[in-house]
Amino acid sequence: MRRDLDALAADMAFDYLGKFGAWQFYTQFTPEGVRELEDLGYGAVWLGGSPPADWDGYEKLLAGSESIVVATSIVNVWGTTAEAAADTYLRLEEKFPGRFLLGIGVGHPEHTG
């Protein structure tokens, strides 16, 4: 049974994220910085600090690069609506197919306003 689970996990690998990624607070990323990371071979940037689902910076980071994945780490369910998260994901997926990874989690409800 364990071997089957290991094989399944290997099949579900996220190769499109690349071997290396960069994580920092979401407002610290710039389109120029993301492009530089992409040029250095990074496969993904992870936007920490619970960015809002409707943050306008996602599109700027994606538009300023060609292939790197922009991933949220995480959008906090206590600070956004399901509709806002879905709208953002669908809009960015249409414009930048396969390059926006929406990470959603419960985070810390006491840190939301």
Please identify what each model-predicted range represents.
Residues R2, D15-W23, A82-G113:
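Flexible, glycine-rich active-site loops centered on histidine and acidic residues
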